[in-house]
Design a protein with these regions (language model features):
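Core alpha/beta nucleotide-donor-binding catalytic domains of modification enzymes
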Residues: 1-210
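Mid-to-C-terminal catalytic/tRNA-binding core of tRNA(Ile)-lysidine synthase
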Residues: 17, 253-282
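Short amphipathic alpha-helical segments
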Residues: 32-35, 225, 274, 278
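Residue-level detector of well-ordered alpha-helical segments, enriched
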Residues: 138, 223, 241, 272-276
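Hydrophobic/aromatic-lined pockets within catalytic cores
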Residues: 147, 213, 281-282
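Contiguous mid-protein beta-loop-alpha structural module that forms a pocket-lining wall or clamp
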Residues: 166-257, 264
Length: 282
């Protein structure tokens, strides 16, 4: 596990000398695995901290997760920041599901803590946010995006590196993570909402993917990941093409305005027109 994750991090240049890493620690198996693995890889390549977000839902179960995170970090000598959010109120105020509201608030906390820590580091050092998504999550995400009608960017799946966010466990699967924890006699918390059929992702995980494996192709998950990788390459190429076309064709640029000739835009294939528009909006 350690070598696999270390090699994957190096392949995708997730950290550089002098960088620091914040682990998003929920207390579940995936984030516990991520923290324990990175703890063993941390010195001297990067400094390590953890952040646990209490979402203000799940009552005693959430309190249990917080206490577990504190105990785990104490045992590993990893500094821990606990942040408290009231997800139901935020969800109601912004017309969001609690799942989406929790995700937004969680990332806000992580980005804030990363920014604060970065100010304490030497110039040029960055703070990365390590998230515990793994191979199974990626396959589920690709399938979910397909069923929602996503474009190539969504169908490419979860990116290993996205700004300061890194995902060192995308090279391993759920079963590998559980096996690693059990072999090391490392405990974790179970989130009861992960079993709820109310969430689409849970239904994909517990019903749709198993059905595809048994009724269509036992290698369905692997093939979904392979397709996502190919689509990701196509997406990256189209982004690059849009950037090159833009740089060649742009004819006017002001502080809040840039333009390319309509003729240059019109002669592009439809898919590149879409990518050009996205590039302009970015």
């Amino acid at each position: 596990m350690l070598k696999k994750v270390r090699d994957y991090m190096r392949e995708h240049e997730m950290t550089a000398p002098g960088d620091a890493v914040i682990v998003a620690l929920s207390g579940g198996a995936d984030s516990v695995c991520l923290l324990t693995v990175l703890k063993q890889l941390a010195t001297p390549e990067f400094l390590l901290r953890a952040v646990h977000v209490h979402h203000g839902i799940r009552g005693a179960e959430a309190d249990r997760d917080e206490a577990f995170a504190q105990k785990l970090c104490e045992s590993l000598s990893v500094p821990l920041c606990v942040a408290y959010c009231h997800v139901p109120a935020y969800a109601a105020e912004h017309g969001l599901s609690e799942e989406e509201a929790g995700r937004i608030l969680r990332y806000q906390v992580l980005e804030k803590e990363a920014g604060k820590w970065e100010q304490e580091l030497p110039a040029g050092s960055r703070v990365k946010i390590a998230l515990a998504h793994h191979r199974d999550d990626n396959a589920e995400t690709i399938l979910h995006h397909l069923l929602r009608g996503s474009g190539l960017t969504g169908l490419a799946g979860i990116r290993p590196v996205q700004g300061r966010r890194i995902r060192p466990l995308l090279c391993v699967g759920r079963e590998e993570i559980r096996a690693y924890l059990e072999a090391g006699h490392i405990s974790w918390c179970e989130d009861s909402t992960n079993q709820s059929p109310d969430y689409t992702r849970n239904r994909i995980r517990s019903q749709v993917l198993p059905l595809l494996k048994t009724a269509v192709n036992e290698q369905a998950e692997e093939h979904i990941l392979q397709a996502g990788q190919i689509i990701g390459q196509a997406d990256a190429y189209l982004r690059q093409q849009a950037e090159e076309i833009w740089q060649e064709a742009v004819c006017g640029r002001e502080e809040d305005l840039a333009a390319i000739p309509l003729t240059a835009f019109a002669r592009q294939p439809e898919i590149l027109k879409t990518y050009l528009i996205r590039h302009m909006l970015d």
